[in-house]
Amino acid sequence: MAKQVEARYQELYVVSSQWVQNKLNQAAKDGYVTGAFGLRVRTPLLHQVIRGNRRTPYEAEAEGRTAGNALGQSWCLLNSRACSEFMAKVRASQHRLTIRPCAQIHDAQYYLIRDDLDPLMFTNEHLAKAVNWNDHPDIYHPEVGLGGELSIFYPDWSKEIEVPNGISEQGLIELVQSATG
């Protein structure tokens, strides 16, 4: 069962896995892996060994795993980039006092939004565009996209209402009414 789960994982993420391996191969030549927006993480052991054979030291393989994790996690900066883009639009709009950021966790953003249709519609439109950004050449891929959807937690955190991108005002009203009874 575990091998089947791993095989399906590898099949699902084949493009991402190959991308990481290509970056680690380059790190073995350069002595560092280049992450999001130019971040460099040194890889001195990878630079000194031949990767991928039975004589590759365990420490070098461990450094490769760590560098691969750092590479992937560095792209969590996309979440910060999306928040900055979105909040610039909020501050320039009539909603500057009705939409407030309160937390960012890995690939999620949390906002306090007044209980009003207009700021919800604004957030659903502009935040969705911001999180779909993938114009950096290191992450652009025609088949692997970025994205996300807005969720409303109402009347409390235990009640999630998933809001489809591009929903109409009437559709949002009906969605919230049906979810809150």
Model segments located where?
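Conserved catalytic core of nucleotide polymerization and phosphodiester-bond processing enzymes
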Residues: M1-G181
